[in-house]
A protein has these predicted regions:
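Conserved alpha/beta-hydrolase catalytic His-Asp/Glu region
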Residues: 131-137, 144-199
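Flexible "cap/lid" loop of the alpha/beta hydrolase fold
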Residues: 107-112, 117-148
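Catalytic histidine-centered segment of alpha/beta-hydrolase-like enzymes
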Residues: 234-247
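Conserved serine/cysteine hydrolase catalytic core
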Residues: 176-230, 239
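Active-site loop/oxyanion-hole signature of alpha/beta-hydrolase fold enzymes
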Residues: 44, 55-97, 248
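Conserved catalytic-core motifs of eukaryotic protein kinase domains, centered on the activation segment
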Residues: 38-40, 65-71, 132-134, 217-218
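Gly/Ala-rich beta-loop-alpha elbow adjacent to hydrolase catalytic centers
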Residues: 98, 102, 106
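Conserved HGGG/HGGXW glycine-rich cap/lid loop of the alpha/beta-hydrolase fold
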Residues: 9-64
Length: 255
């Protein structure tokens, strides 16, 4: 695993897997309470993506990355870290894939990387203010209460409900990071991530799990030039439920 120093933090490092390959590197950004080091090895090793250089990023506060206390953990803050990765590695061109919260982060990063961005792919991203069911549930708590006990309770509840993989990622995520990211998703952005996605002048694709259909957020996107692709036999957690199907959807989006 490799790391970069994040500017403006107290020597905090963001860690990532750099899987060797050819062509334009694909930067992979995970969702809330997740980690790319956990969710995406099976996707990255699928035959349709092998041979492509891929950077599997663990955002600050998640996975193997550091957990600075004096960091905002907003979508914009995380996007700045993704940009820092691209700049520090001196990558002349990149593709971005982000899932859920990572989709919103990828959209924000895309706005800052337009000179280097080749293609943008998002999987069931947060596009409008208000967050999702999970982020709203977390953000409804006071920060101190969530950090003290709420995070542990949510993690244990998920484990008991059969969400073992996600619960494991949550267990190693910083409670403060998860809470602040959730409140950022609820707050949204202005312009909205949806408007930013529709306005970008690069090839864009949005991936939806079949079990998430009907999916209202796709309305109007094809007319704006955003391709919509479906992953069969999967819902929101598509990287876990059908990694091969997600790999194929990403590969097709980058073709």
């Amino acid at each position: 695993m490799k790391s970069i120093l994040i500017p403006g933090t107290d020597d905090s490092r963001m860690r990532y897997h750099d899987l060797p390959g050819d062509g334009t590197p694909l930067v992979v950004i995970h969702g809330l309470g997740c980690a790319s080091s956990c969710d995406y090895p099976a996707v990255a090793s699928d035959p349709v993506l092998t041979g492509r250089r891929m950077l599997l990023v663990d955002l600050l506060g998640s996975g193997f990355s550091d957990r600075p206390q004096q960091f905002g953990y907003t979508v914009a803050d995380h996007a700045a870290c993704v940009v820092a990765l691209v700049e520090q590695l001196d990558l002349p061109a990149v593709d971005l894939f982000g899932h859920s919260m990572g989709g919103a982060i990828a959209i924000e990063a895309a706005m800052r990387l337009q000179g280097r961005l080749r293609r943008l792919v998002v999987g069931e991203p947060n596009l409008v203010p208000g967050g999702g069911v999970f982020s709203r549930r977390l953000a409804a708590n006071p920060e101190a209460a969530y950090v003290a006990a709420g995070h542990r309770a949510v993690t244990e509840s998920s484990r008991k409900d059969g969400g073992d993989v996600w619960a494991a990622s949550m267990a190693v995520s910083a409670p403060l990071a998860v809470y602040r990211a959730a409140t950022s998703l609820v707050a949204g952005s202005d312009p909205s991530w949806r408007d930013l996605l529709m306005g970008l002048d690069v090839p864009r694709s949005l991936i939806v799990g079949e079990r998430s259909l009907p999916y209202a957020d796709t309305e109007g996107l094809p007319e704006a030039g955003v391709s919509v692709r479906i992953v069969a036999a999967a819902g929101h957690s598509m990287a876990v439920e059908n990694p091969s199907g997600l790999a194929k959807a990403i590969s097709d989006s980058l073709a």
